[in-house]
Amino acid sequence: MDVKIASDWKEILSEEFEKPYFRELTDFVRQEYASRRIFPRGSNIFRAFDKCPFDKLKVVIIGQDPYHGEGQANGLCFSVADGVPFPPSLQNIFHEVADDTGSPIPTSGNLDRWAEQGVLLLNAVLTVRAHEAASHAGHGWETFTDAVVRAIAQRKQGIVYMLWGSYAQRKGAIADPQRNCILKAVHPSPLSAYRGFFGSKHFSRANEYLQSIGKAPILW
């Protein structure tokens, strides 16, 4: 597995990489890449940690599973590469950003620009078989990303957690609301966005909180 990851994350997660479950996960993922079509490409598996170093972390957004359509997943939750049509959840995210902050809907769905400002775009599971949703669930990724969230909760305060949907809310439950800003809403999926994602104003609320503790706002 090609582990391209910011050096501070590598140090923080080094013990996790040595645990038996992670070795088993690595073997499974290598075998999958060798025998099947897997997304994202291997060099992008840990891209969320490479684009958003731990020392720059301001916001955590938790997704569930990489996109399993051709050419979509790029290692950041909800994000797609330049030139790829926006999946429905990402369309809804951009509409809420526009309504909330007045920013125009961007031409690219590549969220590198968010990650580079300190937004960790973390899927709970970091790989998936082409066209098979949740096909890599239950193989150890969830344990690893739980450890990531735990490491943030233990080492950082003043973080904005955007928890969209019950899955993300369970995964982010360890974060202390007294020491951080916890923003909860339904998932931006078309199935649920109209039940409270639209109008949640998470993006402006995140920036208000960041500015209140002396941090620069995110240019959404």
Question: What residue spans do the PLM features occupy?
Answer:
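Generic N-terminal amphipathic, Lys/Arg-enriched alpha-helix
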Residues: 1-13
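A polyanion-binding, active-site-adjacent surface
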Residues: 3, 15-163, 167-170, 175-177, ...
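Short, conserved glycine- and acidic-residue-centered signature motifs
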Residues: 199
